[in-house]
Each structure stands twice: as C-alpha cells, then as structure tokens.
Amino acid sequence: MRRFLLASVCVLISLTFTAAPGHATYVREIVLDNGLKVLLLEDHKSPAVTFQVWYRVGSRNEKDGKSGLSHFLEHMLFKGTPKTKPEEYSRIIAKNGGRSNAFTTTDVTVYFATMSRDKIGIQLELEAERMTQAFLGETYFEPEKKVIQEERRLRTEDNPVSALAEVANAVAYTVHPYRRPVIGWMEDIQNLTRQDLLDYYRTYYSPNNAFIVVTGDFSTEEIVPTIRAAYGKIPRGPVPPKLRVQEPAQKGERRVILKKDAELPFLFMFYHAPNLNDPDNFALDVLTVALAGGRSSRLYHDLVYQKRLTRGVDADYSSVSIDPSGLSISAQLMPGKEPAEVEREIDGLLDKVKTDLITERELEKAKNQIEASFIFAQDSIFGQAMKIGYYEATGGWQRMNDYLDGIRTVSREDIRRVARQYLDRDRRTVGTLIPTKEKVP
C-alpha cells in the first residue's frame, strides 16, 4: 500500500478497484482531522476536473410535516455567502468556463462543477465557504418557496406518471421515510420556515457529515494542499442524529388508483427488494435487465411487439441506496387496452420466470448489458465521480470492487430463486392511472 507524507491534518491512502478485467483505477482516500473524507481519482484523458461535495443528508432524514427540507436547502445555498452575491456562484463558474449544478435524493445532497485544471481551485473555495457560511436570509426565503412550489407543480402535479409514482410510493412504504417525495408535499413546503432551514443546515452541513469526490486532470500532490487549506480550518460539527427505521414486512397487496387528466392509462408495480447489503442484489440486477432491459427482453417483446398491449415497458431496480429499496415495473398502455388485461399479462410473464429457468442466452445478454453500462458510466470524469459518490454514500466506495464479479457469478437458478422470493404479490403495491378529462376533487 503506497503512502504519501503529508501534514498531520490528514491521512492519505492509495487504494484500487477494478472496473473491468485488465482495467485498474486508483482511488486515493484522504480523511482530514475534522472528519471530511476526500476521494481522488486522476484521469488525464481530457483537460478537465470534476469536483463534487456530497452531504450525507436527503429526504430520508426529514421528519413528518417537514418534507422537502433537503431540497429547499439545496436551492438556498445558491443565495450567496459573505464573499458571493445571490446566484453569483453559478455565474462565476460559467465565467471561468465551467458547468455547475446540484441535486437532492432520498439519501444525499450533492453540489458539483466541472472546470479546467487551472480553474478548479475557484470552485473548491466557493464550496468550502458555503459549507458553513451560506446566507439563508428571509429576503430570499419566501420567493424561493414559490419557485419550489412551481417546480413541484410542473414535475409532479401536472405530470400524471410522476404523480402516480409518488402516490404509489407513499402507499408502498408505511413507516420508512422513503415514502415521502424528495421535493416535499405541497402543504409541507408551504409551512416550512426559515428557522427550519437554519436548524437543518446547522445539523447536517459539516465536514464530518460530508465527503468530496475529485476526478479528472489534476495532480494529487498539488490539489491535496489546496483542499487542506480550504476545508481543514472548518471545525467539526455536531454528530447528526442517526436514522434507524425498518419498514415492516408487507403482508398483502396494496392498490392505489389515480384519476387524472392524461392521454393513456399507466400501470406501475412496486416490489420491496433489498439494497447492496444483501448479496441477492446482483441477481436482482440481472433479473431486472432480463425482464425489460431492451427491446428483446421478455416483457418488451411480449407486451409491445407480440401482444401490442403497451407502448413501452420498463423495469427498474437500484441496490445503491442506504436502506432497502424496490424493484418496479411500469408500462403505458396502448389506446383501448385495459389495465387489468395488461396486469394479467405481466403477472403471467413473471410467473414463468418463477417456475422456469431463463435461457443461457438471456442470462449472458443481461450480464453483458450490465457490464457495458457499468463501464460506460465511468467513461467521463463526471460519471466516474458519480459512481464513486453513490457507492461511498450508501455503503463505501470500495464496494465498486465487487460489483462486476458479483454479476458474473449469477446463475439461472439464482434468477428463478430471487424472482420467487421478491416478485411476491403480497409484497407489492400496484398503482393505476385512469385518464379523465373531468376535474377530480
């Protein structure tokens, strides 16, 4: 193990993970005395650097009645600091040839920019300042609240499919905070106060509750002292409260019907499934791709090509989450087709996967798709940073080591076993969108 001699403020360790046979990538890990972890991956293919700050806080950390706090705070961090004016952060990055943005999920809040090697220090300093010195003034609080409420209207309330997924998700989880939308419920957003934001900011925005990911054309020996100078002086914050909520086992199918102005009916099925802490996650990934990973997949071939019941069909499963997640199947129906008919067809196809082994060709095709996607996602420095960040946030970036090896070990018997175990109708929630031109109260 290679070690670098640095000041006592940090420890630097060089570690590796293998993204593909014969392709080694070197991630170097720093931990400052204040608890801030920094993950560095040099890649000199193009003259750019991606710098990301990940906070270990998302909608799962919010309380009932306070949904949307994480996302609201993300917006407010662009309203200035002692050294920058409102919205000036983005202008400074753009003026120096960079691109910047931020996003919030159930598990994390992330701020990022991609700039040239000689300019990345600008963003590094800006992010260090707003870690603890963001202006959360009353002047911008109420106007930004209206912006977020309008965002919710456009993305969810005026989008029938998003609205269905949101309400189905709220029914699928009865206890766990994953039941709440990341953007928040409209009434909760309306009732949030500036003091709520201040308390949340002081609780979760600190070096010991964050980590940095840097990828691209930089020198570790040069950037480490810069990071140390900017972030090492920020004091460690209080230890954020630990969230330990376990969703009770679902013991019966749940259903929700949403009547909304829409073009066509839509069907959404959600099955509870484990995250990356369970070794079954590899087989579930392969199962998901075999079911609906492309036009030759089982569901797509049957529902779209042969039976012409749906315009499309999709299956989604992500093991990269802090808590157990789910496997979902969704489909937009063809005109004149009934949701019950499509549901029966899907159930029949799922039953076949539970009773009969998928073919060797299906297995290898799904594995190849997953491997290609995993490697392609790291083709850009931004994609590399995102992959490292998500794994670090949910279980440790080192788990990237195991992913492709885990996929390669999946057998046809594994696929049948996890299909039987997790595609259980007593463990699912079915959401149906019924189009209507009438205003539903």
Regions found by a protein language model. Name each.
Residues 7-16:
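Bacterial N-terminal signal peptides
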Residues 19-24:
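Boundary at the C-terminal end of the N-terminal hydrophobic targeting segment
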Residues 153, 170, 239-298:
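His/Glu-based metal-binding/catalytic segments typifying zinc-dependent metallopeptidases
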Residues 26, 31, 90-239, 257, ...:
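Charge-rich, well-structured scaffold segments of protease-associated domains
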Residues 27, 45, 50-114, 180-183, ...:
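M16/MPP (pitrilysin/insulinase) zinc-metallopeptidase core fold and M16-derived inactive scaffolds
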Residues 1-4:
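Positively charged n-region of N-terminal signal peptides that target proteins for export
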Residues 42-45, 263:
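Peptidyl-prolyl cis-trans isomerase
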